[in-house]
Amino acid sequence: MIEIAFVILIAVIVLSIASIFLSESTRTALIFLGILYLCEFFLLAQVWSLGLAAVNLITGLLTVVIINAFCSSVHLKLVAPRIALDILMIVFVGIITFAFAPQLTTYLIESSQFLIIGVFLFAIGLLQAGTSRNTFRGLISLLILFSGFQIIYA
């Protein structure tokens, strides 16, 4: 992958993750989840065939639409300690991922760019799923965890 495209893609992914967990609106969170699935499509299209990557994109966007249909009336209330915890988790996981993911390339046969993004999404999803009390946030966290696993698996 071209380095500039990787930097742009990781910036969009980090901003999407931050927007998902710091927004009070479910629709805003779901829009950024759709953007996250679009970034995943661009990553998977480089490794998988275009048809499989498109199926993954359509499946993700349909998941976003279905969740929007059922959870559009849910209102999220963010409190200051939770916002600080989310920001600290994103920063902590980002630092750990950028520090240790390149060493994982000796064990996993994958480029370091895919491994960095996959491990970042996997760890963020796992931490958020473990610390969220809201079922909507837990569901979104599990979808992010599965996205990270798919990128690592690809």
What positions do the PLM features span?
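Alpha-helical transmembrane segments of multi-pass membrane proteins predominantly involved
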Residues: 1-154
